[in-house]
Every structure is written in structure tokens, then in C-alpha cells.
Amino acid sequence: MSKSTSKILVIDDDPDFVAAVTPILKSALYEVVAASNPKEAKEKIFAEKPDLILLDIMMDSLFDGFSLCHAIKTSKEFKDYKDTPVIFVSAVKEIAGTRFQFKGDEEGMAGPDDYIDKPVKPDDLLARIARLLKQ
């Protein structure tokens, strides 16, 4: 898949993060679509058919990102998008002293394809996206 035709959906309730990451993605010729909450994200997934999703873990509640990722990867509602790569982004590296680690579907929760800490490093973000879009 050519990155010049790839569409990335950025799902984050922080408008500053969306404003910061959008020019990074556009500089690499990605088309960028944004959503600020899970409800809007679902609408954008169906309307825009993204090639990759950048998903904030914590939005209105702690589990919004986890729940949405699990739905995308496993529910019948999103069956056409279950193979869409999802990268979690978050400023929170730990909850109760436990570092986030994602190795696939553990304990019934389908995880993301990758994880990146905020603030993102542009080169690192673009390299991860390119790797996932080539799979």
C-alpha cells in the first residue's frame, strides 16, 4: 500500500495532540481524518475507511481506547476493519505500577498492533506507521 494513498484516523480527545500530529502525518503524504471520542470514531471508521488508526487509550474514561480497539478487532460490527492496524498513543505509561504491554489477545482483550508514548517522536511515529502499512 502506498503511503501517498493511505488514510489515517487519529482518535484523540486532545485537540492539541491532533493539531501536533496532523502536520507530521501530512508531511509524509498521509491523508488525515480526526475524531475526538469513540462515538465519532465509529462514524468515521465506517465513513472514511481508514488504512490505519492512531488511538488514544484514555479519552472520556480510562477504558475508551481499550474498548474501541477490542471492538474493532473482534466485533461483527467492525468485521470489515478487524485487520486495520491500530496504534495506541498515550501519555500514561503505567496504571497502578503496571507498564502497558500488548502481545495480542490476552485475557480476552484484543490489543493494538503497536504502542507509542506521547509526546510522539515524528520519525518514530512515521517508521511505525510505514511498517504496519507494509504488512
Model features per residue range: what roles?
Residues 12-13, 118:
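Acidic di-acidic motifs
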Residues 15-33:
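Two-component/phosphorelay signaling modules centered on CheY-like receiver
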Residues 63-67, 77, 82, 92-116, ...:
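Alpha4 helix (beta4-alpha4-beta5 surface) of REC/receiver domains from two-component response regulators
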